[in-house]
């Protein structure tokens, strides 16, 4: 059976060596905690922003926007089996779609209403840019 759990990835309410798959999407995580809960051969799938993720929006929010930093990751006890980027433009049909996207970001909570209106007016599309990685938990050695 499948069960989905939402919790702090640094202190998962899950027994050790019981999970076949752990999925981490746009959140910090603990390799040690993932290694604890995954069975040997279990899969850790991570999705993080790649350099150009929502860059057009960031360019309207900040004077000097920075690209997301992407670093080569090492996870002790894991073997990386996938490191791919998913990248595509996302065009908007109306202002409601723009506002819905902005509300899903931390930028929304910092924007005064007048600034939000300007951004909605100027934003035509954004780049969706994800980094998807898969890691297999290696068998423990004595």
What are these regions (language model features)?
Residues 1-12:
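Conserved SAM-binding strand-loop segment of SAM-dependent methyltransferases
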Residues 9-10, 29, 48-53:
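Short, acidic/turn-prone active-site loops that include or flank metal/cofactor-
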Residues 10-22:
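A short acidic, Gly/Pro-enriched loop at the edge of an enzyme's catalytic core
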Residues 20, 25, 47:
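Residues lining the SAM
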Residues 29-45:
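A short glycine-rich, Lys/Arg-flanked "PGG" loop and its adjoining helix->strand segment in the class I
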Residues 43-76:
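Conserved class I S-adenosyl-L-methionine
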Residues 65-99:
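Active-site capping/gating segments
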Residues 86-142:
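Conserved Class I S-adenosyl-L-methionine
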